Design a protein with these regions (language model features):
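Conserved Rossmann-fold NAD(P)-dependent oxidoreductase catalytic core, especially the SDR/UDP-sugar
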Residues: 98-144
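N-terminal Rossmann NAD(P)H-binding glycine-rich loop of SDR-like oxidoreductase domains
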Residues: 5-27
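Mid/C-terminal beta-alpha module of Rossmann-like enzyme folds, strongest
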Residues: 216-279, 297, 302, 309-328
Length: 328
């Protein structure tokens, strides 16, 4: 075990964080995983590391969690997509980040790695994919989740400039792979894999193997420029192309949803939200589904040595894990 380094991973039982913990342990790095009391630990079964039960919005818990750690990987977040405003997510995604940054400075940690989202960076086309220099797109300005993460990014960058916080920001795109116990992004397999007929939108997005993202994040302990953002991006695929990979060997029939149908459903969803009724779909995320949400991961490949993504391998490994865990 690397006795010179202990890494705190917040939200350690989450999809990305669980893969990060595995990558750290494979490098013989000591890990402290911060999770809520009574958290579901299925994604971390069989791993030997220190578990710290606490609340990331509690200053005392945060201070105790950070104490003795030389690196912080802050992956805990409220990823709910049902809010159009950042305020309901502010306490977890912004205030908790502030508490961790303050604790990092008090305890003189060597590096702070903040896990944000690719959605804080404007997307592009296949020919001209989104990169770290792009401001957030207009569609994601109506996503409470994206805006709360963008606010947290700004707080970190201010601390870098004013108080020399040694921090880097990771912006992963849509991640796929094993150990998605919740599931989060893995819900897409539940929608696509078992069904003979699958309704898909016209658009597409960037798909990243969660293990490639985890490698880049762990490399960021010693690589990457302070204050910089890094898109952890893999392959740009339309939803139809992605379905072709997911349905490999199965007679699944793809049915394209007309744009106007999705937009209409999005309008209905936004109306329900105004009435206080939960709806996963809104006008803004309906428009995102019919857009080409594409990015490049060139910067992370060059500066963080992020390995390339094979979506086919990531999909197969994810499906194998879900089936072994009887989730598919």
């Amino acid at each position: 075990m690397n006795s010179e380094m202990k890494v705190l991973v917040t939200g350690a039982n989450g999809f990305l964080a669980a893969n990060v913990v595995r990558e750290l342990l494979s490098r013989d790095i000591e890990v402290r995983g911060m999770v809520r009391q009574h958290a579901d630990m299925k994604s971390l079964e069989g791993l030997d590391f220190e578990i710290f039960h606490g609340n990331i919005t509690n200053a005392s818990d945060v201070d105790k969690a950070v104490s003795g750690c030389s690196v912080i990987i802050h992956a805990a977040a409220d990823t709910s997509q049902r809010y159009s405003q950042a305020s309901p997510l502010y306490r977890v995604n912004v205030e908790a980040t502030r508490l961790l940054v303050e604790a990092a400075q008090r305890h003189k940690t060597d590096r702070f790695i903040f896990i944000s989202t690719g959605n804080t960076i404007g997307f592009g086309s296949r020919e001209n994919p989104g990169h770290e220099g792009n401001p957030i797109g207009s569609l994601f300005q109506k996503s409470g989740y994206a805006m709360s993460k963008l606010e947290a990014e700004k707080r970190i960058q201010e601390e870098v400039k004013k108080n020399n916080l040694n921090a880097v920001i990771m912006n992963p795109t849509f991640m796929i792979g094993p150990f998605d116990a919740k599931p989060g992004s893995g819900r897409i397999f539940k929608m696509m894999y078992p069904n003979k007929m699958v309704f898909i939108p016209r658009g597409g997005k960037n798909f990243t193997d969660v293990r490639a993202a985890s490698t880049a994040i762990c490399n960021a302990i010693t690589m990457g420029k302070t204050g910089e953002r890094y898109l952890l991006a893999g392959e740009n695929l339309s939803y139809h192309e992605f379905l072709e990979i997911v349905r490999f060997g199965k007679k699944t029939i793809p049915v394209l949803i007309p744009d106007w149908v999705l937009i209409f459903l999005g309008v209905c969803g936004s109306f329900l939200r105004r009435l206080g009724i939960h709806s996963e779909l809104s006008i803004s995320n309906a428009k995102i589904l019919v857009s080409d949400d594409y990015y490049t991961g060139r910067k992370a490949a060059e500066e963080l040595k992020m390995p390339p993504t094979s979506v086919r391998v990531a999909v197969n490994d994810a499906i194998d894990w879900f089936q072994k865990d009887k989730m598919l």
